[in-house]
Amino acid sequence: MPLRPRLLLLCLWGLLLQQAETDSEGQTTGELYQRWERYARECEETLTAADPPSGMVCNGSFDMYVCWDYTAANTTAQASCPWYLPWYRHVAAGYVFRQCGSDGQWGPWRDHTQCENPEKNGAFQDQRLILERLQVVYTVGYSLSLGTLLLALLILSLFRRLHCTRNYIHMNVFLSFMLRAVAILTRDRLLPTLGPYPGDRTLTLRNQALAACRTAQIVTQYCVGANYTWLLVEGVYLHHLLVIVGGSEKGHFRCYLLLGWGAPALFVIPWVIVRYLLENTQCWERNEVKAIWWIIRTPILITILINFFIFIRILGILVSKLRTRQMRCPDYRLRLARSTLTLVPLLGVHEVVFAPVTEEQAEGTLRFAKLAFEIFLSSFQGFLVSVLYCFINKEVQSEIRRSWRHRVLHLSLRDERPCPHAELGPQALPSRSAPREVPITGSTLPSGPLHGPGEEVLESYC
């Protein structure tokens, strides 16, 4: 049997076994498989004996689930629920629907909701309701993050005094969060219109629409991967400043750009090739063959673990420096807690919580807990990063206040006009010199600056 039909058979067989594991019909796995084989054999015999109709038609075939007869082009075919299903007596009157395109090719989707196990429908509806609510949550989160990230990116771009390697990396992190949000929101807009829902028997997915849908999936995977690699760049750069260089902000920015935007292509492109060759089904939104999904999942897990170890190392450095300053216990704990909470969203440390739990292990309550945790924090992560590293950053606030003061002074000097009857003198002339500007090198804390190599870096980040 060719590899692709074999994979489809394995996926179908796993689905049937999952639904039949609590079946009350008394069939064993061997009996179910024998019934399926007999159904497939009878389908082939029926199609061989039948005479294909004239004109443009979709060929009769067995798609590993149900037997399809020859169908005229641009019509919706229907087939009775396959009798090998363990719960067939409950769905004997049901049908499976599939669209035959105008080009004589079967559409990739089929509607088999009338043939599903009725005992599982209640649980399915509950799960669907939970997923719909989670979708609302992350839609709000990504939309909010997109707006704040755009504003933060404009602020760091417009104020030249804020231009430095550290903020350049921040800007790329903001951009990666924005691309991730746009890609996910766009994909969600495409899937409901391109993918049929239960009861929609006439919807079909044309070749162009299918290509657009898969392209959206590819772009989404790249943007998500780029987001994780740029979080890794933040961790590597901060570790480089604190441990290797000892406080210098002069880094190899081109290498960081190559790592942040180039590394995701190293695992997204192989995933696209393997997916196209071995699991080229529907819109690529389902990962039935887990081995293919691990091509993308493995590099992301590696970036999460590396950033977690960097996070632990930075906390160790911070603890040692705070102890050196002999801070009082309340101040010590407050500073450590604030630094921890500040670095968690920037490095994506929260991902470690469910990183050991694979997709295969996550079932039932654990699966929904993992989804809720990751979806909520990932969607609002961009919002938190933009607030912590732009809007409440003391360096950014100082630059905005300085620019505002200069703007107000400029307007007041422009509107002020000399009086012709007044006695002019040196004391009556307004001063044209601006207040002395103090170079901004980083944010300072009320507890006072740290001293020593790398201290200014910790002040800027923590």
From Swiss-Prot:
It is found in: Cell membrane. GO terms for cellular component: plasma membrane. Residues 1-18 form the signal peptide. Keywords: Cell membrane, Disulfide bond, G-protein coupled receptor, Glycoprotein, Membrane, Receptor, Signal, Transducer, Transmembrane, Transmembrane helix. The chain crosses the membrane at residues 136-158, 167-186, 215-239, 252-275, 291-316, 339-359, 375-395. One of its GO terms (molecular function) is gastric inhibitory peptide receptor activity. It is a multi-pass membrane protein. Widely distributed including pancreatic islets, brain and various peripheral tissues. Residues 19-135, 187-214, 276-290, 360-374 are extracellular. Glycans are attached at residues 59, 74. Residues 159-166, 240-251, 317-338, 396-462 are cytoplasmic. N-glycosylation is required for cell surface expression and lengthens receptor half-life by preventing degradation in the ER. Belongs to the G-protein coupled receptor 2 family. This is a receptor for GIP. The activity of this receptor is mediated by G proteins which activate adenylyl cyclase. PANTHER family: GASTRIC INHIBITORY POLYPEPTIDE RECEPTOR, PDF RECEPTOR-LIKE PROTEIN-RELATED. This is Gastric inhibitory polypeptide receptor.
